[in-house]
């Protein structure tokens, strides 16, 4: 370890102890050496005993800086792991940091462009438009066509800082997991590994640009979502250049009402957008918090969303999509047995799970939800409660489903903030039913056959030869089978003969011994014993050798 990493490790330990986070570890799993070490750091006392655990964790992460703040934000979406109180505390974390020097920003941009800024841009604004833990945004005008653009550049040395903090997190998570045991519900090492994957993706701005281009192409003809244009030739690992947009923040409901936005239509389009991204395109924006979503200023009666920051995207397998759609339909049909079957069939929980116990657990959680009107039932809450229940049955964490759940909760919260009477089920049900019909109906079968036709057309000329080879192999197998069967029958015949001789010899020897003890005729007794011994020798010698068939 370097001196810098040792200092950072001490800073993390000091902050952890100052906020009493060690008190959150159950004492029954705390080993003696941990207690001894804690006692030796007597000057690092809990200075926030008056605060509850969730608030102390939030404040500690706020103090530890951007990487921990983003980790806390991610944890706030893992309501399958945390209580609602803790999740709400962590959701208050704000990813706001002071901007770094504009001279450093210029230097970083020019290093990526391999040219002075003035070669490509006019009116570069040194004062950043926005600043966050990973990157900073500046505005400019594109010299080639006069288009207004924004430049997003990574903070200096952010990669090294992130990797160092993630390494410390991973070590702490492994230690915590060793205390809690392999069967603990929290699985800290798994959570940190998920976070590592997410944040390392955000450190590659080129990947964000490619994600944005793909999402934009998926909605080119849409009246519901607009993704700003990416100038791909000016996009690199540490810098991206995109079209500058003008919109109303989706969280500013007063401004939306002031411009006469159709909030009911906007809320319904948000739900449709989610299901379209997930089920039609299998490529969904997984970071749709209000800071990344704007609403168009033009055509307020026919509003559309503007999506930013495509650094975190999600995809599902075809099986995941089908199981997910069936889960929702089974829930609203109150078919809890089917929900339990789906979790087992999908492999999300083990095949040896007690399906009746799982069904009952699902029913206990889901049935009370139907005490409220359908338009008040939250899809995200349903998914969350199902995941929480499945975790009790050792559900294997599915990172793609965690992203989906987080996105769904964002979309629902957003939709009901815009239009509290939003009926998610009525909006989503036709979409889900149509999608299921397309996947499992005659149309789906015809589509799969059509998709496979080129392959079978290519294989058709070889089909007669393959049939002949298989028939020949079948004949050979039949011959081999007959030979083995014949050998087996002969082996069994020998075994029966040997067993018969051995049993007969034993009977004769026993009878001869009895006659001898009863003073019977000597020749009869000795003759019986002698014959028995001869038969025993013959039986022993005729035993078949052990064979493997």
UniProtKB/Swiss-Prot annotation:
List the molecular function annotations (GO) for this entry: ATP binding; protein kinase activity
Q: Which SUPFAM superfamilies match?
A: Protein kinase-like (PK-like)
Instruction: Write out the GO biological process terms.
Output: regulation of ubiquinone biosynthetic process; ubiquinone biosynthetic process
Its top-level enzyme class, in one word, is: transferase
Classify the protein's membrane topology as the record does.
Answer: Multi-pass membrane protein
Q: What is its EC number?
A: 2.7.-.-
Compartment(s) of residence? Cell inner membrane
Question: What are the positions of the active site?
Answer: 287 (proton acceptor)
Annotated TM spans = 498-518, 520-540
By its UniProt entry, which CDD domains does this protein fall under? UbiB
Residues reported in the UniProt entry to bind ATP = 129-137, 152
* Cellular component per GO, a single term: plasma membrane
Q: Which domain of life does the protein's organism represent?
A: Bacteria
Protein kinase domain spans which residues?
A: 123-501
Query: Which PANTHER family does this chain map to?
Result: CHAPERONE-ACTIVITY OF BC1 COMPLEX CABC1 -RELATED, PROTEIN ACTIVITY OF BC1 COMPLEX KINASE 7, CHLOROPLASTIC
General function of this protein: Is probably a protein kinase regulator of UbiI activity which is involved in aerobic coenzyme Q (ubiquinone) biosynthesis.
The record's family statement is: Belongs to the ABC1 family. UbiB subfamily.
- The protein's name: Probable protein kinase UbiB
Q: Which organism is it from?
A: Shewanella piezotolerans (strain WP3 / JCM 13877)
């Amino acid at each position: 370890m370097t001196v810098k990493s040792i200092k950072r490790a001490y800073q993390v330990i000091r902050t952890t102890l100052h906020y009493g986070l060690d008190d959150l570890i159950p004492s029954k799993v705390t080993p003696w050496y941990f207690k001894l070490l804690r006692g030796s750091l007597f000057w690092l006392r809990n200075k926030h005993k008056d605060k509850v655990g969730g608030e102390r964790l939030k404040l500690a992460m706020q103090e530890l800086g951007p990487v921990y703040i983003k980790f806390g934000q991610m944890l706030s979406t893992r309501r399958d792991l945390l209580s609602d109180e803790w999740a709400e505390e962590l959701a208050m974390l704000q990813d706001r940091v002071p901007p770094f020097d504009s001279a450093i920003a210029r230097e970083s941009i020019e290093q990526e462009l391999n040219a002075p800024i003035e070669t490509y841009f006019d009116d570069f604004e040194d004062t950043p438009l926005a600043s966050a833990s990973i990157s900073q945004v500046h505005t400019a005008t594109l010299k080639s066509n006069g288009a207004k653009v924004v430049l997003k550049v990574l903070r200096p040395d952010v990669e090294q800082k992130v990797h160092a903090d993630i390494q410390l997190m991973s070590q702490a998570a492994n230690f915590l997991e060793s205390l809690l045991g392999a069967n603990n519900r929290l699985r800290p090492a798994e959570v940190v590994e998920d976070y590592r994957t997410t944040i390392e993706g955000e450190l590659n701005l080129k990947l964000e640009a490619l994600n944005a281009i793909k999402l934009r192409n998926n909605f080119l003809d849409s009246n519901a979502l607009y993704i700003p244009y990416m100038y791909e030739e000016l996009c690199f690992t540490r810098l991206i250049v995109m079209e500058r947009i003008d919109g109303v923040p989706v969280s500013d409901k007063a401004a939306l009402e002031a411009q006469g936005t159709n909030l009911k239509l906007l809320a319904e389009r948000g739900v449709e957008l989610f299901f379209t991204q997930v089920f039609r395109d299998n490529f969904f924006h997984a970071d749709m918090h209000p800071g990344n979503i704007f609403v168009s200023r033009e055509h307020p009666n026919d509003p559309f969303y503007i999506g930013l920051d495509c650094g975190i995207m999600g995809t599902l397998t075809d099986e995941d999509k089908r199981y997910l759609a069936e889960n929702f339909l089974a829930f609203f049909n109150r078919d809890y047995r089917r929900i339990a079957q789906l979790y087992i069939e999908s492999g999300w929980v083990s095949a040896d799970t007690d399906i009746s116990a799982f069904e009952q657990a699902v029913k206990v959680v889901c049935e009370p939800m139907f005490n409220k009107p359908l338009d008040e039932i939250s899809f995200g809450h349903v998914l969350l409660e199902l995941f929480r229940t499945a975790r009790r049955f050792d559900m294997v964490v599915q990172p793609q489903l965690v992203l989906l759940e987080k996105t769904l909760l964002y979309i629902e919260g957003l939709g009901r903030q815009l239009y509290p009477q939003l009926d998610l089920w009525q909006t989503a049900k036709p979409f889900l039913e149509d999608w299921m019909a397309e996947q499992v109906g005659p149309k789906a079968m015809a589509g799969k056959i059509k998709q496979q036709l080129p392959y079978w057309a290519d294989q058709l000329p070889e089909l007669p030869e393959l049939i002949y080879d298989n028939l020949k192999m079948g004949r050979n197998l039949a011959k081999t089978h007959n030979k083995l069967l014949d050998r087996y029958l002969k082996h069994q015949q020998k075994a029966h003969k040997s067993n018969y001789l051995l049993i007969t010899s034993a009977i004769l020897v026993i009878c001869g011994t009895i006659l001898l003890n009863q003073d019977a005729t000597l020749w009869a007794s000795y003759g019986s014993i002698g014959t028995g011994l001869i038969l025993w020798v013959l039986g022993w010698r005729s035993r078949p050798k052990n064979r493997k068939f």
